[in-house]
């Protein structure tokens, strides 16, 4: 008997599972808020230099840019006796007395003057947040293995609530960045524990539905963020409103049961049995729960206990050629997806469209994108779907280079299309990666893939800074990287309708079988070629 069969005895899809998935899914609504929060809390408004204190305010104080608007980062050197208000030949200087902002919102950019020479600090703040997610993955993963999934989930909720609230009261930008880094670490803990506890307690036949439901909560969270940002123009209150609910989620998480596999592998058989009996009672199968014993639990999960004793590490991903290929191609696909996704998701204000409406559109495109991706995965296969999603996204991003800024509708349509393709790419990669890696290396493979996605999302804001050299440079980098990721996916094995590989030998045999079939097909085609006879 496997754990799935034990789960069937206590109720594999009853009231417990519905409540369990709901409690795991609700906090995901808030995860979207934190991931994309700087779209609204770090908006850069129209601005220009503040005139010197002893100058009379007027158009002549500021030089004009080629569009006839006040320069953002320069002003005329103030000469008290100057008599020519429109004299464009006068010397200019940086904004020594600060800036005047044309905005009804309060943002970190306005509060800490993150413009002109300091504008890189805005992108750095987002990169530091992403670095927190990157660092939090392995650190919290190790803590999760040591202390359990449930305590780490509860602690991560509490940590996100505290660090997010701390960011709302930050007295300076460095303090704000530290708290945002901790927010990123917390999100890693929440994501890791949510995935594991969802898979643990839901039957195989329902995992796709439950996982998709949780994924759609992230999409809904993007809608909620737009509404909150519109209603709350002060960045500190918006930050606090997005963080405070996690105090409540930390309390609700005490109801969520611990992973049975973790309890068994940790030798906590008595607690594992009590947890299963509690689930059985909740699902109306109390008598079935009473029949379970510790000895039965040990016997039926012996395979899990034995397999856990064999340790596989990162080096095993590079032991054989096919695994090296899979790891390289998947790493590039994950990196390019995270890299390009956040270039679009965090660039809402660049398209000259109302950011609240555009954020709703960016969130809404995920719904049809993920649905179409699921259909394509089921009928066209994983490899083709993954390749074309990244190739289409890369093409859309590169096309933005050739569309003038005045054509806002077309630029927005291309960005929305690209973002939808990248959302589908994420959905495809989660499934594809879990199917390509053998069971003994699946967790390690997913871990290294997640790292590359986070590296991409961390670097993306910094690459945007290259736009100061030439506006088209960031899109060239983002688009080309997506094309490379899509091309790499063509070299992966197709997993549609194939059983999951269990061991390294399984994937080697699978690769040999594919190679043999390909060679036989080429030989058959060659045998059908009729040589042309030359005249004598």
Curated annotation (Swiss-Prot):
Its main location: membrane. It comes from the Eukaryota. It catalyses: estrone 3-sulfate(out) + glutarate(in) = estrone 3-sulfate(in) + glutarate(out); estrone 3-sulfate(in) + 2-oxoglutarate(out) = estrone 3-sulfate(out) + 2-oxoglutarate(in); glutarate(in) + 2-oxoglutarate(out) = glutarate(out) + 2-oxoglutarate(in); urate(in) + 2-oxoglutarate(out) = urate(out) + 2-oxoglutarate(in). GO terms for molecular function: antiporter activity; organic anion transmembrane transporter activity; prostaglandin transmembrane transporter activity; protein kinase C binding; quaternary ammonium group transmembrane transporter activity; solute:inorganic anion antiporter activity; xenobiotic transmembrane transporter activity. Signal peptide: none annotated. It is found in: Basolateral cell membrane. This is Organic anion transporter 3. It comes from Rattus norvegicus (Rat). The gene is Slc22a8.
């Amino acid at each position: 008997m496997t754990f799935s069969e034990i789960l069937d005895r206590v109720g594999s899809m009853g009231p417990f599972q519905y409540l369990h998935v709901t409690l795991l899914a609700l906090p995901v609504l808030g995860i979207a808020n934190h991931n994309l929060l700087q779209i609204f809390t770090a908006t850069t408004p129209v601005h220009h230099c503040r005139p010197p204190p002893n100058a009379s305010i007027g158009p002549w104080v500021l030089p004009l840019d080629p569009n006839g608007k006040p320069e953002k980062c320069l002003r005329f050197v103030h000469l008290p006796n100057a008599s020519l208000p429109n004299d464009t030949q006068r010397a200019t200087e940086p904004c020594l007395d600060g800036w005047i902002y044309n905005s009804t919102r309060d943002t970190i950019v306005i509060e800490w003057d993150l413009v002109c020479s300091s504008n890189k600090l805005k992108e750095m703040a987002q990169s530091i947040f992403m670095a927190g997610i990157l660092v939090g993955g392995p650190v919290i993963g190790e803590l999760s293995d040591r202390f359990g999934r449930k305590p780490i989930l509860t602690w991560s909720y509490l940590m996100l609530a505290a660090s997010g609230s701390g960011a709302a009261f930050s007295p300076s930008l460095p303090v704000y960045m530290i708290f945002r880094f901790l927010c990123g670490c917390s999100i890693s803990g929440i994501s890791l524990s949510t995935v594991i506890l969802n898979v643990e307690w839901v039957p195989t036949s329902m995992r796709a539905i439950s996982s998709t439901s949780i994924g759609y909560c992230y999409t809904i969270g993007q809608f909620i963020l737009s509404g909150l940002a519109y209603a709350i123009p002060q960045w500190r209150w918006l930050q606090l409103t997005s963080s405070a609910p996690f105090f409540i989620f930390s309390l609700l998480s005490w109801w969520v049961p611990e992973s049975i596999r973790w309890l068994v592998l940790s030798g906590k058989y008595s607690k594992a049995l009590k947890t299963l009996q509690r689930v059985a009672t909740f699902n109306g199968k109390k008598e079935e729960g009473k029949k379970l014993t510790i000895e039965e639990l040990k016997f039926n999960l012996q395979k899990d206990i034995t397999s856990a004793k064999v340790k596989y590490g990162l080096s095993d991903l590079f032991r054989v050629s096919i695994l090296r290929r899979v790891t390289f191609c998947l790493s590039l696909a994950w990196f390019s997806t995270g890299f390009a996704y956040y270039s679009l998701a965090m660039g809402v204000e660049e398209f000259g469209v109302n950011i609240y409406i555009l954020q709703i559109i960016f969130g809404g495109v995920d719904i049809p994108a993920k649905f179409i991706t699921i259909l394509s995965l089921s009928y066209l296969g994983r490899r083709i779907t993954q390749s074309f999603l990244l190739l289409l996204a890369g093409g859309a991003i590169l096309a933005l280079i050739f569309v003038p800024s005045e054509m806002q509708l077309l630029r927005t349509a291309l960005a929305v299309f690209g973002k939808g393709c990248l959302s589908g790419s994420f959905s495809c990669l989660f499934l594809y990666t879990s199917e390509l890696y053998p069971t003994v290396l699946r967790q390690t493979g997913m871990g290294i893939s997640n790292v590359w996605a986070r590296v991409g999302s961390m670097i993306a804001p910094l690459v945007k800074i290259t736009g100061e050299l030439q506006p088209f440079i960031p899109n060239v980098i983002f688009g080309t990287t997506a094309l490379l990721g899509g091309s790499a996916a063509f070299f992966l094995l197709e997993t549609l309708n194939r059983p999951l590989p269990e061991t390294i030998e399984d994937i080697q045999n699978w690769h040999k079988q594919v190679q043999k079939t390909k060679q036989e097909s080429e030989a058959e085609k060659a045998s059908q070629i009729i040589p042309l006879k030359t005249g004598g």
